[in-house]
Amino acid sequence: MGMSDAFPGRERSRHMGELKRGPNRWDVYLEVQPDAELGAVRGRIHFVGTTEATHRATGWVFLEWQERDVLERFGEFSAVELLQFVEAIPG
């Protein structure tokens, strides 16, 4: 199991790419989870750095009807916006 394989929600996550800024590198994962009560799908973003201690995650920032809608919304974020997300998360 590699550094990016172990975090809560990994089994529901898709690897979306990698971010780099200076010496920092983050693997970016999008976790989706059905919400049966609402009949919708929630999504949040995980940023996994070079050690397990550098795992950061957003709250549930997406709420859409289908998983493909969450993926589409995620695709609207630029690399700069994703870096702003990870830098704003306490860690």
How should these model regions be labeled?
Residues F7, E11, W26, T51-H55, ...:
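Generic alpha-helix detector with strongest preference for long hydrophobic helices that associate
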Residues R21, D35-L38, W65-E67:
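A short, structured loop/turn motif at beta-sheet edges
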Residues T58-G91:
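Short, compact, well-ordered microdomains
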Residues H15, G39-V41, E76, G91:
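Broad hydrophobic/π-residue packing in well-ordered secondary structure
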Residues M1, V28-V32, I45-F47, F74-F77, ...:
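Generic hydrophobic secondary-structure signal
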Residues M1-P8, E52-A57, I89-G91:
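Generic structural signal for short, solvent-exposed loop/turn connectors between secondary structure elements
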Residues M1-D27:
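Negatively charged, low-complexity tracts enriched in Asp/Glu with abundant Ser/Thr
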Residues W26-V61:
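A short, structured beta-strand/loop element
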